């Protein structure tokens, strides 16, 4: 956690940042921060560290706090503390990673419930980059059998590596 550990409640505006996975775009994060009303910003991922904390809190500023949760398995995805941290967020960002980890660990869990709450009840800005973007839709490539190139998928959309799911994860 970077910033104030005390929870704040701000007026938020819903919206989505769908980022490709290369360089982070300051303007996109600033847009999320503005729509969060300067509240608590949460980043979720399955691997990695808290590199977004100094970027959002110090470099961009304007948030009460930022916390990164590394949710690396089913047990972590059903942790009540992770759930509470997520539902208390005024902005949520899903970091780069492996979308199979996200689908496998987070689907049918408290993390999924918390993200759906933020989107559909609390109406906060939500963003994702790379794998975090890939799962923010009704249909998504889950990468269950590894990566597939565009040329492979287009030449054989029914190939063994093409694993696509529909309407069974996040309710966005």
Located regions from the model:
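Extended, subdomain-level signal for the structured scaffold at the beginning of enzyme domains
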Residues: 1-101
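Class I SAM-dependent methyltransferase SAM-binding "motif I" and its flanking Rossmann-like core
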Residues: 104-172
């Amino acid at each position: 956690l970077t910033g104030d550990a005390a929870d704040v409640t701000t007026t938020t505006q819903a919206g989505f940042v769908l980022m490709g996975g290369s360089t982070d775009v300051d303007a996109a994060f600033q847009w999320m921060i503005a729509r969060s009303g300067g509240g608590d910003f949460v980043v979720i991922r399955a691997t990695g560290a808290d590199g977004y904390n100094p970027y959002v809190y110090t470099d961009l500023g304007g948030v009460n706090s930022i916390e990164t949760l590394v949710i690396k398995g089913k047990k972590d995805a059903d942790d009540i503390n992770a759930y509470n941290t997520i539902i208390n967020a005024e902005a949520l960002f899903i970091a780069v990673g492996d979308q199979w980890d996200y689908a496998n660990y987070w689907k049918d869990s408290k993390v999924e419930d918390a993200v759906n709450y933020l989107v559909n009840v609390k109406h906060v800005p939500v963003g994702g980059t790379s794998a975090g973007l890939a799962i923010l839709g009704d249909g998504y490539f889950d990468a269950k059998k590894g990566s597939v190139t565009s040329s492979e998928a287009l030449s054989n959309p029914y190939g063994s590596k093409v694993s696509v799911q529909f309407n069974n994860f996040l309710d966005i």
